[in-house]
Amino acid sequence: NIVKNILKNKELNYNSITKKEQIFVRERSTSKILKLKLDYDKNNISEITPEMLQLVEKNSPKDNQSYSDILTNVYIKESELKFNPIKIVELKKEKNEELKNIGKTFKKLLENTKKDEYWRIKTGILGKKIPSTNNDSLGSDTSNTKSINIYKNTIKNYLGFATFKDKEQWEFLYKTNKYNFEIIGGTTMNSENVYVIDFSPKEKGLFQGRLYISIETFALIRADYKYAPNKLGKEMYMLGLGFSQTNFSGSIYFEKDMNKYNLKYFSFQNNNKFSLNRKIAWQKKKKRLLINKKLKEIKIGVDLVLAQKEVIELLVINQLKISDIEFNNFIEKKHVNVTYVNQFDKNLWKNHTIIEPTQEM
């Protein structure tokens, strides 16, 4: 009953005001190519040769790492979010010259497309039109500038973790019958008395962890949880596509202010595995009245297995209630500047409140 009361009292306990927050987000991602095999099937694009595919297979980095730090103000009104970055720092990616030249070849092909022509990527009956090279969704005007939507949508997605709306990530709150709960004691957090409750999965449950729940309000103040041993998340294998969630762990912490609870910090880690074993076609087509004409095509057999690990940390530095008018009056920029570095350094964030860089970074 104590755990069930978290969702019952959610609207009473957690702030849903129009507000401006300053937040710091750290993203760390690693990916490892476990298998990559490309088979040259058919081709009438003279600029792309079998040797190019061999170079892609040989030189594609087997281990990739990315790090980014984002300090930003966000304006929030119900489900709307506006993004006003203060500073964004990303790890500079090493570029393989041979892969870079191949990339230039593909870019040139896209640029040499007439108004009544377009490129399309296709696998089986599924296909998607490739945006033109001047489309904002491709990212940036220069190497140090990116579309704001790339970051805005990511931050909005991360903040969704703290709303408890994802019924799969917060399964133990929505499907309490799948879990065993045990009150192991009590403590105080920010002068508030709380239950300390451990939980573990029954046969169909997924997570194990510890909850800190207010005795007075039944608000979830802190949670630390992860996949229980021998448990996996989503798994999907269909038509040569595979995806499995192999690990998850998360922590979240709220602070009380004026009888409402506000997010202060969370972190979570996802481990996923992807596989692809399909033929993929890259086609150039000419628009016609009834059926578009295929001008060029390359078809490649792809056998790929990729493991990925993602670690996200988010710290709310401060929060200020604002009016709907102030929210509506703020106009976002279309692009943001990014600082690229070879390694992270404390001096990058001098005079700013952040999460300290790790030795690994």
Question: What do these predicted regions represent?
Answer:
Residues 1-166, 170-176, 190, 243-361:
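Surface-exposed, low-complexity/disordered segments
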Residues 213-214, 238-240, 280-283:
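Short, charged/polar low-complexity linear motifs in solvent-exposed/disordered segments
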Residues 167, 178-185:
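Low-complexity, intrinsically disordered segments exposed to solvent
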Residues 207, 232-237, 273-278:
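A short, polar/proline- and glycine-enriched secondary-structure boundary/capping micro-motif
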Residues 182-234, 242-256:
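Feature captures eukaryotic membrane-trafficking machinery centered on endolysosomal pathways
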